[in-house]
Amino acid sequence: MPPVDKQAVAAAFGRAAPHYQQHNELQRRSADALMARLPARRFARVLDAGCGPGGISRYWRDNGCEVTALDLSAQMLAEARRQQAADHYVQADIEAIPLASAQFDLVWSNLAVQWCDSLQDAVQELYRMLRPGGVLAFTTLAADSLPELRQAWRAIDEKPHANRFLSREALDSALSGLRGEFALQTLSVPFADALSAMRSLKGIGATHLHEGRASRTLTRSRLQQLQLAWPKQQGACPLTYHIFTGVMTRD
């Protein structure tokens, strides 16, 4: 895959910051699934890497943790700060965190590392942040996510309209040498129509394409074509995601 344009990613999420919370059902469900895999213990210091507007940062802070919220997007961090979500705020790339090693009891990253150039580099950088005995918990999107979006667009053209994500084999390879508990699960989010489904992607900033944006405008007629071609489930237009979860403890 081509290198990730980090500035474009940050800009897409920045545009989504004011209304992100209205469209983040996937993020909430993914966070719930990751939370269920954490060991039952208290974490004094938490790094929320890819914090977005700070919903999970605020959860940890409300539970008595000292929280550092990190995001690539200045606008997302500004929203997190407005919500008083954390104790500290850092604008940075997950693959190059400007913090000293071994600071945190929990490093949390929910659906953020898929925007990195290298999963291996991102996870190693997050792992570097852990104190001995600390926990790294992360989720990312896996291959064959968003099949409905791809199928619907094929009725119109063959251009890429969704990012490609790593296969389970590639994910396992990137994490080889790291001990932890890894799992893959499927989450499906229903929408009333194709337009609502696509608005949800825009609403969370997940519209940046690593391979470049298709140039054609979404006209009313194309939207009607998408609606007709979208695979339906009980009358709804779903978006299906394959979520890879990793939980590791540093020796």
UniProtKB/Swiss-Prot annotation:
Its EC number is 2.1.1.197. InterPro entries: BioC (IPR011814), Methyltransf_11 (IPR013216), SAM-dependent_MTases_sf (IPR029063). SUPFAM superfamilies: S-adenosyl-L-methionine-dependent methyltransferases (SSF53335). Pfam families: Methyltransf_11. Gene3D superfamilies: Vaccinia Virus protein VP39. GO terms for molecular function: carboxyl-O-methyltransferase activity; malonyl-CoA methyltransferase activity; S-adenosylmethionine-dependent methyltransferase activity. One of its GO terms (biological process) is methylation. It is an enzyme of class 2 (transferase). The keyword Transferase applies. Keywords: Biotin biosynthesis, Methyltransferase, S-adenosyl-L-methionine, Transferase. Pathway: Cofactor biosynthesis; biotin biosynthesis. It comes from the Bacteria. HAMAP family: BioC (MF_00835). NCBIfam families: BioC, PRK10258.1. This is Malonyl-[acyl-carrier protein] O-methyltransferase. It comes from Enterobacter lignolyticus (strain SCF1).
